[in-house]
């Protein structure tokens, strides 16, 4: 029996499993999924878990079940591409085809104290730790959120909804929030923060983090806790692979989402160097094309000379439970409709992933 080994139970590999099972996987193949957790975490909702507006149960789903699908739970400590072996804990798992989708972790940009003194939301365990902190903060406390990208905006707004009795400061490097999107969208988000008493600090440059202080352009600002959302990078085991990578640490891939030196190895999600933000949507689009490549290969057909471009539709974010913002097909949507859109996307994902 040949072995398709999937590393990481995130959005990309979930889509691959659902596309292949029950009828597309060749009869001489089995799938093994490796993950640290015995469930699929809804990473796009970790901000709500960290703020306490969603429960742990609401941000996870069961993995699919099939007679030719099995699981190995544990941390991947080594990937040997030459020997086609992956080390998980004390076990080694071999493969015929490998898909690396181990996701990302926080990038602290060598800022002193950032890793030691910041709370984060990139991984579920970190979001749980952040939840404990946000739930136990005394009234009147100040939380500094470093980074005003999508994650920073969502955790700051969700925290405002769950803790109306604390002060929130959102540190943004740019002149305006979400500078890559239309000014109308930025102004809407900024206005929401003003109306909901979240202080946005533009032109920020956090140079140091202490237990109860953030240093912004060398100015010491007192905070009771810091939440870091200022960048991500592939997990360390992926960054340590001796293959070509971009400056971001993400792995260079060809149009078939393979590493150029080994057609048996595919990269999906946050670990892949793509001309798009590393999002759940991008990972799922990649996964669909990877399955198409599998089908060509298994049918002994020549791969297309040019793969279609990934059709990333846009971005949707929430501002608490009632408002949101979206940029879809070059159209800006704000307010209640955008929030309904985000809830609908999540509902459809859960429905299709069952």
Which role does the model predict for each range below?
Residues 77-79, 207, 317:
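Conserved positions in beta-strands of structured domains
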């Amino acid at each position: 029996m040949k072995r398709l080994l999937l590393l990481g139970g995130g959005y990309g590999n979930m889509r691959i499993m659902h596309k292949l099972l029950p009828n597309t996987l060749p009869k001489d193949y089995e799938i093994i999924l490796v993950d640290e957790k015995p469930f699929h975490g809804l990473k796009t909702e970790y901000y709500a878990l960290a703020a306490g507006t969603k429960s742990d149960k609401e941000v996870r789903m069961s993995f699919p079940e099939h007679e030719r699908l099995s699981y190995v739970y544990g941390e991947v400590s080594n990937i040997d591409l030459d020997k086609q072996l992956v080390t998980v804990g004390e076990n080694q798992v071999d493969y015929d085809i490998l898909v690396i989708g181990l996701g990302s972790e926080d990038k602290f940009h060598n800022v002193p104290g950032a890793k030691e003194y910041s709370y984060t939301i990139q991984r579920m365990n970190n979001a749980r730790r952040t939840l404990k902190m946000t739930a136990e903060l005394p009234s009147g406390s100040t939380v500094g959120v470093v980074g005003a990208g999508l994650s920073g905006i969502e955790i700051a707004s969700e925290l405002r909804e769950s803790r109306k009795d604390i002060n929130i400061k959102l540190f943004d490097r740019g002149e305006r929030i979400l500078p890559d999107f239309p000014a109308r969208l930025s102004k809407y988000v900024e206005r929401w923060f003003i109306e909901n008493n979240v202080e946005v600090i533009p032109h920020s440059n956090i140079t140091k983090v202490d237990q109860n202080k953030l240093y912004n352009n060398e100015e010491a600002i007192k905070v009771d806790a810091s939440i870091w959302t200022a960048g991500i990078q592939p997990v360390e085991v992926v960054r340590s692979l001796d293959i070509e990578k971009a400056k971001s640490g993400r792995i260079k891939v060809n149009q078939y989402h393979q590493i150029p030196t080994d057609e048996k190895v595919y990269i999906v999600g946050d670990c892949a160097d793509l001309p798009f933000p590393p999002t759940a949507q991008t990972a799922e689009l990649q996964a669909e094309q990877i399955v198409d490549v599998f089908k060509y290969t298994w049918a002994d057909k020549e791969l297309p000379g040019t793969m279609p471009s990934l059709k990333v539709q846009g971005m949707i974010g929430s501002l608490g439970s009632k408002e949101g913002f979206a940029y879809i097909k070059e159209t800006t949507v704000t307010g209640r409709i955008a929030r309904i859109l985000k809830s609908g996307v999540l509902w459809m994902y859960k429905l299709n992933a069952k």
